[in-house]
Each structure stands twice: as C-alpha cells, then as structure tokens.
C-alpha cells in the first residue's frame, strides 16, 4: 500500500509506494514542485489558487484565464494552443483542440450538460435524476449508468458492456473501498485508511 506524508500545514510532502518509488512535493510561494524518479514538475498558481503554468523537462504549459478563473486558452510547448468558448452563464460551449478539432456542448435549463458533439459528429447524450445528479451517459457504443445512495454519495458506475466500479464509504462519508470489476468478473479492490482527514495508505487486493 502507499504511504502518504504531510507537513505541519497539512500539505502532502511525499508518497511512498510498495515498489520503493517515492514522490516528493516541495512548496515555494505559489509554486509546488513534485519530483519522481529524478524528474521535476513545477506547478504555479495565481493568488486565487488557479493553475497558471506547468514546467517540466518537455517545456512550459501556460494557462490563460478569464476573470472567472476559467481558461480562455492553453498554450503548450511549440505554441500549440487549445481554445475555449463560453456562453453568458460561463458554461463552456466549445473546445478547439489542434489535434482533434472542435467539440461543442449544449445544456438544459438547469445548467446540466445534455449533449456533447465532437468534430467527427460523434455525440454523447447525458441524462440526470430529479436531484440533477448524472444518471446516464450514452455513446454510440455503450451506456454508462451512475447510482447514488441516500447520502448523495456515488455508489456504483456500471457500463452496458459489463464493467463496473463500486464505492463504499465510512460513517464520516470518506471513501473506504473501491472495487473495479472487469467483463470477465476479475476485480481490483482498493481499501483506504485515513489519518485525520488525509489518506494515510491504500491497500490493493
């Protein structure tokens, strides 16, 4: 299982995996630097906590933000730019990707995403329950269904092709286990242990 370490400000400082791999996190002003296997990734945030840049060995990614904190564009190394469009309510209506083209989005009166159409005219349709919780996501190939308990916690995500993920929570509403089941009924279970409000270990079975 993974071991998590935190500093006196309750910030994550290290993740130690059973394999011996360790990831460290260092903090300086509005920047956080993560080092894993000798590779450093520096993330910088603005005064409101919004990510504005990522620097790694491949170069710099810059996030240009609107006044509401949402990105208007993201510029990757080589000046590769992804652009975003929004409606008057601040809802994303388009995403222009240099490799995959433009995706458009449509919403219902409650602001729920109803339809997503990509550059190849492939459509994803979404439905919601009376509490505006996502109920189904339907693609041409399959449908994914979402189930909740009386505490508004997501308990199951199941696909029409036979895969599923089950979630169990403790009395404090924290995720205590997650079981992923494949089409052949093989599964992976993760059990979470907490120290205060932080995950202290994850056990895989």
Predicted regions mapped to residue ranges:
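Beta-strand elements of repeat-based all-beta scaffolds
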Residues: 1-56, 60-76, 80-97, 101-118, ...
